[in-house]
Amino acid sequence: MNKGKKKVEAQVFFQQEIAPGIFDMWLTTDLAKTANAGQFIGVYPADKSKLLPRPISICEVDKDNNRLRIVYRVAGGGTEEFSSYKAGKRVQILGILGNGFPIREGEGK
């Protein structure tokens, strides 16, 4: 359940391009403690001419290490900027937003 949104600083833990124009990024933030897959965060570009955060869905949460995983497609100036971020980069995010969904263990094939 969404307990209110906060603008906080997060740190890029890992990022890689997994397909042309598609990026996999892990962010370290205390917001991970209350996040669930299916919710989303707003990621603010460092370029102050781009005022609004870019909404990106959370696809995985590592609560033990306070990390969120987002996978996004470069679709404009904001996400183009994000694609250049390296581990250690500090970014402003807004979250946690939306409603998540439970992840159930599969029953196998």
Can you describe what each PLM-predicted range is?
Residues 2-86:
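Ferredoxin-reductase
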Residues 80-109:
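FNR/FR-type flavoprotein reductase catalytic core
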